């Protein structure tokens, strides 16, 4: 438990202290956000706000994770694990793709960075590497970081994918989650605040899996998850980094996370869902991100078939802005929705445990 607190605290401190440094540095370099002309008129005032703040989130994540392990040496805590390093690597790789996207936008002074093909190739390389490695590194109880079974709260024994389909599934999750978080990052603090809530829920889930792991506590309801405590450190560091960044990203934002942050955080959600065996549960806990992405899919599909729009603008947080809601009202209410989704997900997680032990 101490390591989890250290991870969150270090990440928060690094993120909250580094972000204003980045604001000044990026402002001097002219690394400002370009705003879509077709977006809400109120957003035009945000043009030039420093972007690529995801660098601070990644720095906080790395500092929190490795710092907690360095402190853990003092009381013989377990070191870094395959699962933790894989999620950290996937997160960083997606952050690298996002950084390139942001940098191109800034250099060309437009709101379009990497083309769709280049971005998809970057996501593909990261996801395939993650998927292949996730089936290696067998640990106690012959567990690997990933599983060829589809999972809800734990593996569903009757649904087996096979290694090739599993790797393809990893790409689907990485692409879906990274793009979902990217689409959500359209209002000040919306993505960072929502991610803090989701990762906070996953701190609870991974710590519970650690306390009830089949490796150390075999019995009814135990969890076959490799390295749950190390995954808890990743979640805690991620949550701390997001909260620290949110201090400066809250409305009116002094800096945006950019694709550097949003793609990285989406990659983290994908990696955590796979390594914790909660791929379907993540859809519930991350329901806000799912809804934002779904609103875009619905808008495009309906418009192409009927030339009519379901929403005034997609993603649908802009729909409410154009309906007259203040930006801060949309943000706070969406945070509440993210909190409700996280609470429902935790309730489902615990109710499954009670059912498993016959409670």
From Swiss-Prot:
It is found in: Cell membrane. One of its GO terms (biological process) is regulation of cell shape. Pathway: Cell wall biogenesis; peptidoglycan biosynthesis. Pfam families: Glycos_transf_4, MraY_sig1. The chain crosses the membrane at residues 3-23, 53-73, 84-104, 117-137, 156-176, 187-207, 231-251, 255-275, 283-303, 330-350. It is a multi-pass membrane protein. Its EC number is 2.7.8.13. Its main location: membrane. GO terms for molecular function: metal ion binding; phospho-N-acetylmuramoyl-pentapeptide-transferase activity; UDP-N-acetylmuramoyl-L-alanyl-D-glutamyl-meso-2,6-diaminopimelyl-D-alanyl-D-alanine:undecaprenyl-phosphate transferase activity. Disulfide bonds: none annotated. The keyword RNA-binding does not apply. Keywords: Cell cycle, Cell division, Cell membrane, Cell shape, Cell wall biogenesis/degradation, Magnesium, Membrane, Metal-binding, Peptidoglycan synthesis, Transferase, Transmembrane, Transmembrane helix. InterPro entries: Glycosyl_transferase_4, PNAcMuramoyl-5peptid_Trfase, PNAcMuramoyl-5peptid_Trfase_CS. This is Phospho-N-acetylmuramoyl-pentapeptide-transferase. It comes from Rhodococcus jostii (strain RHA1).
